């Protein structure tokens, strides 16, 4: 059995990798927002989001699947909010109610 410090180091490495992947995902979300702003495409696409969650979580053990779905939904929501803020920044005239 491995010692706790060794396991903790592995967790730290995984957390660092997750951080880098999250930053990459948000960078891609920003790219998506810019493209959608130019084409007047909608940010929120519930069917697409549901499809992503379903495909990515398929085949997982049930308890872990529930936790992963929660994590994935949170990440998708953060990406969507980031896209909205970018579109607001790019095209404030589309949001006349925004101060």
List PLM regions with ranges.
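Domain-level signature for soluble enzymes in the chorismate/prephenate branch of the shikimate pathway
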Residues: 1-99
């Amino acid at each position: 059995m491995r010692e706790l410090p060794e396991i903790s180091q592995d967790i730290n490495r995984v957390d660092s990798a997750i951080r880098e992947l999250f930053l990459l995902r948000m960078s891609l979300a920003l790219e998506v927002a810019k493209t959608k702003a130019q084409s007047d495409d909608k940010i929120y696409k519930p069917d697409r989001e549901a499809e992503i969650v379903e495909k990515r979580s398929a085949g997982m053990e049930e308890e872990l699947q529930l936790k992963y779905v929660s994590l994935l939904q949170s990440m998708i929501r953060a990406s969507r909010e980031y896209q909205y803020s970018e579109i607001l920044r790019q095209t404030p005239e589309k949001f006349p109610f925004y101060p």
